[in-house]
Amino acid sequence: MNPSRYRKRLRLAAIVLALVAGCGSSNPLGGGSASGDLKSIVVGSADFPESKIIAEIYAQALEANGFNVGRQFGIGSRETYVPAVRDHSIDLVPEYTGNLLQYFDPKTTVTTPDAVELALARALPGDLSILTPSPANDTDTVAVTEATARKWNLKTIGDLAAHSAEVKFGAPSEFQTRTEGLPGLKAKYGLDIKPDNFVSISDGGGPATVRALTDGTVTAADIFSTSPAIPQNKLVVLEDPKNNFLAANVVPLVSSQKKSD
C-alpha cells in the first residue's frame, strides 16, 4: 500500500475516532461521509467483552463515515494483538493508556491521565501511534466480595497482603507476568500469590470472573473499575494508594507506516 495514502487513511480514521471519544456514552454513529474511495480498514479487539464492544463502536462509527471495515475481534491478549497491529494484520485496536504504557515502559512512574498519555506517546515504537483517548478511565482493580472485605477488614490492597497465603486470585493468565499484575502487587504491597493459588480466567474481568468471585472459587479478582458487576454484586474495590494500576483511558492504537520519501 502507498505509504502516503495509508497515512491519509489513518488521519481520517483519527478524526472519526476523536469524535467517538468526545461522544462519551452517547450515540456516535450519526454523521457525514468520508471519501467514498477509501480502502478497507481492519478493526481488531482483545479477547474480552469490553474490548469487543468498544471495537464494534469504532467499526460502526467508521462505517458511518464511509470506511469499509473488516473485523477481527477476540484476537487474544496484548502480547498477541500488538504485533498484529505492527505487521498491519489489523489497523487499529482499542487499548488502555496506562496498561499499554506499562507494556512498553515497565519502569514508568507516572500515574495521572495526562502524564500517562504523554509518556505513552513517547514510549511507543515508531511504527505505532495512539489517537485521541476517551475521557473514560477504566482501570484494573483488585475486587473482593463484601463478605470477604468484612471478614478481613479490608480497605486497601495492602490489607489483603496480610492474608496472601489464603487468597486465591482470579485473572487472565498474562496477569501473572505483567508489570501491573502479580509482580506489581507483590513489589508494592507484598501481596504474594503462589502459583497454585492463581486461577486463570480468560474473560478479562467478565461474567466468568465475577461468577468465580461470588461463588467462592477465588477470593480476589482483577475486574475493570467501570464494570456494572461491581455494584450489581456489591463487590468491594480495594484502594490502590501506591498506584499499581495507572490511569487507563480508552484509546485507539493504530499502526503508522514508517515515513518514506
Language model feature labels by segment:
Residues 2-13:
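Bacterial N-terminal signal peptides that target proteins for export
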Residues 18-22:
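C-terminal motif of bacterial Sec signal peptides marking the signal peptidase cleavage site
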Residues 24-27:
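Bacterial signal peptide processing site
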Residues 38-70, 75, 135-209, 215:
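Bilobed "Venus flytrap"/periplasmic-binding protein-like clamshell domains
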Residues 77-78, 88-100, 115-117, 145, ...:
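Beta->alpha turn/N-cap motifs
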Residues 104-131, 217, 228-242:
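Ligand-binding "clamshell"
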Residues 113, 132-141, 240-249:
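Short Pro/Gly-enriched coil loops immediately N-terminal to beta-strands
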Residues 140-150, 248-260:
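A bilobed periplasmic-binding-protein/Venus flytrap-type ligand-binding module shared by bacterial periplasmic
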